[in-house]
UniProtKB/Swiss-Prot annotation:
This is Kelch-like ECH-associated protein 1. It is found in: Cytoplasm; Nucleus. Component of the BCR(KEAP1) E3 ubiquitin ligase complex, at least composed of 2 molecules of CUL3, 2 molecules of KEAP1, and RBX1. Interacts with NFE2L2/NRF2; the interaction is direct. Forms a ternary complex with NFE2L2/NRF2 and PGAM5. Interacts with (phosphorylated) SQSTM1/p62; the interaction is direct and inactivates the BCR(KEAP1) complex by sequestering it in inclusion bodies, promoting its degradation. Interacts with NFE2L1. Interacts with BPTF and PTMA. Interacts with MAP1LC3B. Interacts indirectly with ENC1. Interacts with SESN1 and SESN2. Interacts with HSP90AA1 and HSP90AB1. Substrate-specific adapter of a BCR (BTB-CUL3-RBX1) E3 ubiquitin ligase complex that regulates the response to oxidative stress by targeting NFE2L2/NRF2 for ubiquitination. KEAP1 acts as a key sensor of oxidative and electrophilic stress: in normal conditions, the BCR(KEAP1) complex mediates ubiquitination and degradation of NFE2L2/NRF2, a transcription factor regulating expression of many cytoprotective genes. One of its GO terms (biological process) is cellular response to oxidative stress. There is a cross-link at residue 151 (N5-[4-(S-L-cysteinyl)-5-methyl-1H-imidazol-2-yl]-L-ornithine (Cys-Arg) (interchain with R-135 in KEAP1)). The modification S-nitrosocysteine is found at residue 151. The modification S-cGMP-cysteine is found at residue 434. Pfam families: BACK, BTB, Kelch_1, Kelch_KLHDC2_KLHL20_DRC7. CDD domains: BACK_KLHL19_KEAP1, BTB_POZ_KLHL19_KEAP1. Residues 77-149 form the BTB domain. One of its GO terms (cellular component) is nucleus. The record marks 151, 257, 273, 288, 434 as: Sensor for electrophilic agents.
Length: 624
């Protein structure tokens, strides 16, 4: 009789059962044995002999558990760490070199690279608290660590010293979760001191995003002037207006005026003072005690005030914006009837987001951004039930994905143009039925109020509007009789309009924007054809020159600037409502078609602001 190859008897292996049904197809006589304690497998080899494999899955855990028991009972230990930290009592910890070396590259180098500690039974350790070392030794044996939240910084510092990366990451993740306006600067400084790059970056990003709240905390007032200058020089500070940065600096100086008044000039040069409004500067020059006592700083701000009010070209500083995506928003539009869509295009990945609809469908509206909020102004609701011109002003908050109504304009305005100066929205021209407006009104968001300002010299609907050097430009349009190539400029200090050089081409419904201190007018309708030509106005030479034409003819298009390039969206080519989006690169003077809208449309309101909160979008799209 052939002997049974399987073991028998009362031993542990008698608990194995052959599981032939689990053998993979083509495995021949392979047999899998399984138990609750281990996994074993027999497989054929290339030479016809079978191979037996066995794995005890929790062996490592069990082995380290036994080694930890040996450590606690001080058996088979081959090193004693004698830990001394400042005035704390010294402590001794017995351990196994191999376990310490497996957990920490520092211990590994200490015990294997021929250093003097390699042959020592007692090793002196300084610079780390005994309680911290105790927790790190426990982690080496148990892969588990526990501490009070007040001890996290100390443990993380020790883990960095001994290069125990897993503990460093765990502590870093915990501290990121604890970031708060009151502790973010302290955590950032700590991370920089110990060289934890990721935690330092996350803490700095938190400071930039919550700048307003951080500047009210004690840690902010303990910054050095160099640290403060570095902070306020960031492009990605999340502030609604530059006055927040100005006030933060003045308050920092007032905290210790005697010692800090010497730094005011350096701070003001880091503040983007040309982004402050003349009214704000005038008030500070009159009332700020810090400026009153420093003639150099006062003269510096007086010069900026004069440059702003005289509308002199200045060096263009990047707009401050948090490091979140900035998207191109399109509101409303027309395709067979007015639309209520709000969508956002991300040029970085080519995706579109569908967001909260306008409360009332509108086309011929205009879009703009103030303080990160998107405003939809005027337009008309063309519907099967009739056409209604709109005086509405609605505000969209990307953080809540919600619209809220604001005070309406004094009159409805369809095919309107808008621009923003000093945080105020200017609504220009447009029509109400057969009335073509030359009137202009200004909206103050802080007061939720509209006020009429000086009317344009010419009635204009389908007017393109842009702002450059705090001057409001109205370009082209239709006066009720003729399409226009004329353009005019509004001076807010004088409350008056002046004509400027006319365009080379008649354009109604053109897209108008500002890029690199020039005004661009793209497309439009000349009374006979939709246009693809584009021209640029140089305010220094007061001349219009043609640049490369768009690939498609289009009027009633949307236009905006994103990261130094012009984007035109949709419009009407005389036959079709376009869904194409083109991008202009001023460096190469070329247009390229970059994407398509989700559907063709004309008369959209377009503007650029921060990416919406995905959490709010997901919650509002949830149908559960």
């Amino acid at each position: 009789m052939q002997p049974d190859p399987r073991p028998s008897g009362a031993g542990a292996c008698s608990r194995f059962l052959p599981l032939r049904s689990q053998c993979p197809e083509g495995a021949g006589d392979a047999v899998m044995y399984a138990s609750t304690e281990c996994k074993a497998e027999v497989t054929p080899s290339q030479h016809g002999n079978r191979t037996f494999s066995y794995t005890l899955e929790d062996h490592t855990k069990q082995a380290f558990g036994i080694m930890n028991e040996l450590r606690l009972s001080q058996q088979l230990c081959d090193v004693t760490l004698q830990v001394k930290y400042q005035d704390a009592p010294a402590a001794q910890f017995m351990a196994h070199k191999v376990v310490l070396a497996s957990s920490s590259p520092v211990f590994k180098a200490m015990f294997t690279n021929g250093l003097r500690e390699q042959g020592m039974e007692v090793v002196s350790i300084e610079g780390i608290h005994p309680k911290v070392m105790e927790r790190l030794i426990e982690f080496a044996y148990t892969a588990s660590i526990s501490m009070g939240e007040k001890c996290v910084l100390h443990v993380m510092n020790g883990a960095v010293m001994y290069q125990i990366d897993s503990v460093v990451r765990a502590c870093s993740d915990f501290l990121v979760q604890q970031l708060d306006p009151s502790n973010a600067i302290g955590i950032a400084n700590f991370a920089e001191q110990i060289g934890c790059v990721e935690l330092h970056q996350r803490a700095r990003e938190y400071i930039y995003m919550h700048f307003g709240e951080v500047t009210k905390q004690e840690e902010f007032f303990n910054l050095s002037h160099c640290q403060l200058v570095t902070l306020i020089s960031r492009d990605d500070l999340n502030v609604r207006c530059e006055s927040e940065v100005f006030h933060a600096c003045i308050n920092w100086v007032k905290y210790d005026c005697e010692q800090r008044r010497f730094y005011v000039q350096a701070l003001l040069r880091a503040v983007r003072c040309h982004s402050l409004t003349p009214n704000f500067l005038q008030m500070q020059l009159q009332k700020c005690e810090i400026l009153q006592s420093d003639s150099r700083c006062k003269d510096y701000l007086v010069k900026i005030f004069e440059e702003l009010t005289l509308h002199k070209p200045t060096q263009v500083m990047p707009c401050r914006a948090p490091k979140v995506g900035r998207l191109i928003y399109t509101a409303g539009g027309y395709f067979r009837q007015s639309l209520s869509y709000l969508e956002a295009y991300n040029p970085s990945d080519g995706t579109w987001l569908r967001l909260a609809d306008l409360q009332v469908p509108r086309s011929g509206l205009a879009g703009c951004v103030v303080g990160g909020l998107l405003y939809a102004v005027g337009g008309r609701n063309n519907s099967p039930d009739g056409n209604t011109d709109s005086s509405a002003l609605d505000c969209y908050n990307p953080m809540t994905n919600q619209w809220s109504p604001c005070a309406p304009m004094s009159v409805p305005r369809n095919r309107i143009g808008v621009g923003v100066i000093d945080g105020h929205i200017y609504a220009v021209g447009g029509s109400h039925g057969c009335i073509h407006h030359n009137s202009v009104e200004r909206y103050e968001p802080e007061r939720d109020e509209w006020h009429l300002v000086a009317p344009m010299l010419t009635r204009r609907i389908g007017v393109g509007v842009a702002v450059l050097n705090r001057l409001l430009y109205a370009v082209g349009g239709f006066d009720g009789t003729n399409r226009l190539n004329s353009a005019e400029c509004y001076y807010p200090e004088r409350n008056e309009w002046r004509m400027i050089t006319a365009m080379n081409t008649i354009r109604s419904g053109a897209g108008v924007c500002v890029l690199h201190n020039c005004i661009y007018a793209a497309g439009g309708y000349d009374g006979q054809d939709q246009l693809n030509s584009v021209e640029r106005y140089d305010v220094e030479t007061e001349t219009w020159t043609f640049v490369a034409p768009m690939k498609h003819r289009r009027s009633a298009l949307g236009i905006t600037v994103h990261q130094g390039r012009i984007y035109v969206l949709g419009g009407y080519d005389g036959h079709t409502f376009l869904d194409s989006v083109e991008c202009y690169d001023p460096d190469t003077d070329t247009w390229s078609e970059v994407t398509r809208m989700t559907s063709g449309r004309s008369g959209v309101g377009v503007a650029v602001t921060m990416e919406p909160c995905r959490k709010q979008i997901d919650q509002q799209n949830c149908t559960c």
